[in-house]
Amino acid sequence: MPAPEPTPDLPIAETLACPVPPEQRPLEQYRELQQSWFFTWPHASFKGLAVPLVRSWLIVLPLTMLVATGSVPLRHNLPRLVVAGAVAGLVVPLLMLLRQWLGWTNLQKRLMATAVDYEESGWYDGQVWEKPLAWREQDLLVATHEVKPVLERLQQAMAITAALMLVGTSLCQAL
C-alpha cells in the first residue's frame, strides 16, 4: 500500500496569487471607511460622533419648526410646537446613524467571512475566493478591535436618539 502524500501546511489559496482586485478587499474597504469624512465620525470616540449629529440636528431644526407651524393646533401651543419640531429634527441624525451602521456592519461581515466575494469586470461575474489563513487572522483582528467598538458606539447613539424621540413624543402628548 503506497504511503499517502504529505499535505502542505498552507491551503492552496495561500500559494496562489490573490485574484481579488485591491479595491474590493475587506481591509481596503476598511481603510476607505476610515478615511471617509462621513464614516470616520464614530471611529475615534463617542464625542467625535455626537458633535456632527448635533450639528446636523441644529441645521435641520429651523426647517422642522417651520413645517410644524403649518399645524393649526401646534401654532396656538408654543411649547408643543417647539417639542414637535425638535423631535422631527431627530429623524435626520437617526437616518445618518442608520447609514453609518449599515456601512460598518457590511464591512464587519466581510472581515469575519472566510471567503471574499468579488467581481472582476462587472456585476454578472461574481466570484468567491477563499481567504488565506494570514488574511483571515488579520481581518478578524481588525473586525474585533477596530470595527466592533465603532458598531457599539453607533448602537449607543441610535439608542440615545430613539430614546430622545420617545421622550419628546411623550412630552408633546403630555403638553
Segment roles from a protein language model:
Residues 17-71:
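Cytosolic-side membrane-entry/anchor segment at the start of a transmembrane helix
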